[in-house]
């Protein structure tokens, strides 16, 4: 009991004693809690480095404290008096303070951090740590891993390499070196921004996503520098294969909303400011679609030259009923006419004379879902422009060969591209529209829109022509917003498109329509002058008056208005079977079918007569159109080389009506605008061709009935088919001695349109 407490003998009551005792206990407990226990430290003399190292910073401050320094009465702060220390004391104080506060081996404990529990320490002991472990003694016993070139010895920080190479996955897209982050969540969050920034820096095209409203075709698949027997392209790549063979699953992960406006990052090397050579260089963007609608017709490239129709149907028939369409169907028509002109084609000398040795075919399915199922079984490459690859079986004499072929489907939404949807209702402006021909099969309407806009100016609308299967035929129309861009494209006349997949020479001509002569306004227009000074529709009479005095240096070449030379044919007389391989040798059998396949689908055809006094005509004859003219056959070459004398040249038979002349044998056809270095006559190229002669009252017609025969001869351009079309030979009867030819008269067909 404390002596301050009152005893009962001194007169204190029991209650007072208890109260005083409780107050003393509470006061003693409060004082014990307030005052920390005193640290018992040995006296250490300040002798520099020989002094023992203090345990804490508090001890260090207490060690260097001067007795004459006034401290805070509360004891919270301690003034060492650093300014009163000697230089040795300052250096020793700072060195010891650094040893206590900064340690390379011990981490500083954060204020408020809880002490790890026993479970946490156990987890930290067995869980893999990101920090390098301590170095193990070299004198450890040998391990079984040493026999295989491995050691259980762990590396220290100095022995460990700074950056170890990572394994690169074959399916992973690498966008440069990423900054290594210790936390995987941070690295994961950087993937999408890195992809976006890197693709923008490289100028990679953004995937094209088309709305459903567009209907689309594909162009011709021949390259102008190659023969028709070569396929258009062997190199291709495309985006990953969809998991389900339904059109709803042909969607890319990087796909945008169809309603969102898409841009195209061009990689072109030439633009409208660098178009002096008439070339455009660039890359096709990858194509991704949302719920595409495929054409029932597909392109199959890289097929063996001796592939049979049965082998193709056997390979593709598992996806649905299909038929084979040979390109151009030339060989099937030639096969029945070997008695007229012997052919040197290797295919026609073999048992496979019923097929065309072109290296590609077209497969036509009954249902578009069969195309989706086929694409599900195809392989692709990342970043392609719409090519797929499929393996077919080709039967050989002693074995079966597995051949990988190229599959190019066509999405019907690629036939039209208009930035302004109101044009679909109001229609396009013909006076700002050009006709483009010889388009490549990978050029969609949107791709053509970008190319023409990049070269000439703002484009309003692009439409591509298709066949009855909604498959492209290689031609289209481009409408510009301004007349300046329109005239610039017309004056250029052609455009060389260069990509890593193909090179194509695209022909550009004014889009012609049925109208009257702009001079007399009474006769219907038969031709159009594309020269900038004229740029009018003419009838034959007005053309002879306005252009009868043209000199050889300034020749205006007229463009034939298609409606004046041909009309659209509905097709009731077309061949009902896609693979029919015979042509009648008789005179009057299936003449209409012969003529319906003479015309090249969408290829530009220059037509004219081989007369020195005949001015050149050229124009386009559309697909599924038939000539409303009387044909005739001419045996010998129509345009011999320039070194031949005029005596060897044979003239046309004089007809009072327009006529088409076919040359069964190979002839020398001059390339338009290609001049020879030795003579002013254009360079010649071997090809077969068809010629259209004008009316008898036209200037320079074969019968020389025109009053303009006294005019000087003008340069003649023969048929130019750009290596993409070999017309079938037409059966005829009668002698070809001299200049006497027997024409084949076309029976009257009442259902011409």
Curated annotation (Swiss-Prot):
CDD domains in UniProt: Bbox1, RRM1_CPEB1, RRM2_CPEB1
Disordered: annotated span: 111-286, 567-589
Chain intervals with Low complexity compositional bias: 227-239
Any Gene Ontology biological process: negative regulation of cytoplasmic translation
Membrane-crossing segments per the record: none
GO molecular function, one term: mRNA 3'-UTR binding
Superkingdom of source: Eukaryota
Keyword Amino-acid biosynthesis applies: no
Sequence ranges of Basic and acidic residues compositional bias: 131-142, 175-188
Pfam families tied to this protein: CEBP_ZZ, RRM_7
Gene Ontology cellular component annotations, sorted alphabetically: cytoplasm; neuron projection; nucleus; synapse
Keywords recorded for this protein, A-Z: RNA-binding
Stored PANTHER family: CYTOPLASMIC POLYADENYLATION ELEMENT BINDING PROTEIN CPEB, CYTOPLASMIC POLYADENYLATION ELEMENT-BINDING PROTEIN 1
The protein's name: Cytoplasmic polyadenylation element-binding protein 3
């Amino acid at each position: 009991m404390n002596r301050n407490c009152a005893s009962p003998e001194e007169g204190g009551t029991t209650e007072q004693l208890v109260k005083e005792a409780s107050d003393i206990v509470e006061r003693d407990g409060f004082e014990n809690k307030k005052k920390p226990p005193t640290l018992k430290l040995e006296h250490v003399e300040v002798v520099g480095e020989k002094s023992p190292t203090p345990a804490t910073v508090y001890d260090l401050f207490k060690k260097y404290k001067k007795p004459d320094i006034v401290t805070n009465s509360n004891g919270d702060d301690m003034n060492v008096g650093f300014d009163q220390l000697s230089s040795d004391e300052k250096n020793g104080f700072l060195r010891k303070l650094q040893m206590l506060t900064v340690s390379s081996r011990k981490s500083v404990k954060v204020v408020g951090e809880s002490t790890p529990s026993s479970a946490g320490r156990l987890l930290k002991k067995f869980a893999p740590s990101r920090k390098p472990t301590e170095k193990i003694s070299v004198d450890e016993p040998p391990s079984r891993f040493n026999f295989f070139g491995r050691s259980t010895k762990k590396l220290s920080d100095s022995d460990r390499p700074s950056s170890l190479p990572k394994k690169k996955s074959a399916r992973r897209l690498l966008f440069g070196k990423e900054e290594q982050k210790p936390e995987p969540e941070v690295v994961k969050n950087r993937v999408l921004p890195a992809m976006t920034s890197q693709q923008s820096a490289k100028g990679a095209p953004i995937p094209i996503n088309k709305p459903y409203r567009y209907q689309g075709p594909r162009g011709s698949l021949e390259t102008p520098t190659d023969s028709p027997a070569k396929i258009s392209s062997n190199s291709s790549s495309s985006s990953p294969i969809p998991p389900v063979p339904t059109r709803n699953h042909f969607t890319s992960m990087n796909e945008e909303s169809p309603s969102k406006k898409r841009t195209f990052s061009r990689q072109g090397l030439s633009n409208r400011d660098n178009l002096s050579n008439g070339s455009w260089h660039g890359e096709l963007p990858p194509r991704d679609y949302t719920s595409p609608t495929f054409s029932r017709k597909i392109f199959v490239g890289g097929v063996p030259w001796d592939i049979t129709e049965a082998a193709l149907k056997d390979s593709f028939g598992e996806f649905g009923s299909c038929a084979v369409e040979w390109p151009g169907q030339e060989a099937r028509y030639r096969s029945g006419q070997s008695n007229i002109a012997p052919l040197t084609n290797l295919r026609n000398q073999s048992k496979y004379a019923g097929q065309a040795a072109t290296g590609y075919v077209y497969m036509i399915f009954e249902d578009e879902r069969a195309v989706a199922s086929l694409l599900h079984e195809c392989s692709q490459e990342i970043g392609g422009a719409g090519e797929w690859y499929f393996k077919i079986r080709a039967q050989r004499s002693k074995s079966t060969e597995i051949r990988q072929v190229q599959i190019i489907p066509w999405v019907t939404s690629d036939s039209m591209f208009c930035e302004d949807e109101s044009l679909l209702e109001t229609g396009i402006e013909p006076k700002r529209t050009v006709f483009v021909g010889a388009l490549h099969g990978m050029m969609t309407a949107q791709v053509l829109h970008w190319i023409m806009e990049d070269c000439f100016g703002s484009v309003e609308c692009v439409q591509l022509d298709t066949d009855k299967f909604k498959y492209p035929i290689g031609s289209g129309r481009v409408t510009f917003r301004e007349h300046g861009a329109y005239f610039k494209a017309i004056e250029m006349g052609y455009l060389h498109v260069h990509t890593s997949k193909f090179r194509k020479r695209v022909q550009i001509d004014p889009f012609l329509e049925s109208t009257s002569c702009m001079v007399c306004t009474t006769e219907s227009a038969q031709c159009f002058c594309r020269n900038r000074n004229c740029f009018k529709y003419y009838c034959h009479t007005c053309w002879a008056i306005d252009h009868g005095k043209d000199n050889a240096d300034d020749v205006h070449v007229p463009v034939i208005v298609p409606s004046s030379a041909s009309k659209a044919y509905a097709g009731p007389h077309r061949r009902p079977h896609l693979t029919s391989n015979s042509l009648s040798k008789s005179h009057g059998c299936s003449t209409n079918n012969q003529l319906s396949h003479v015309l090249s689908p969408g290829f530009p055809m220059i037509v004219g007569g081989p007369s020195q006094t005949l001015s050149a005509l050229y124009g386009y004859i559309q697909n599924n159109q038939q000539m409303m003219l009387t044909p005739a056959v001419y045996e010998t070459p129509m345009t011999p080389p320039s070194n031949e004398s005029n005596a060897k040249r044979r003239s046309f038979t004089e007809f009072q009506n327009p006529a088409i002349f076919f040359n069964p044998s190979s002839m020398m056809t001059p390339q338009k605008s290609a001049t020879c270095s030795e003579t002013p006559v254009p360079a010649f190229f071997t090809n077969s061709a068809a010629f259209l002669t004008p009316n008898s009252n036209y200037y320079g017609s074969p019968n020389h009935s025109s009053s303009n025969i006294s005019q000087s001869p003008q340069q003649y351009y023969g048929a130019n088919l750009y290596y993409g079309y070999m017309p079938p030979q037409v059966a005829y009867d009668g002698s070809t001695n001299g200049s006497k030819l027997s024409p084949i008269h076309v029976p009257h067909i009442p259902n011409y349109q």
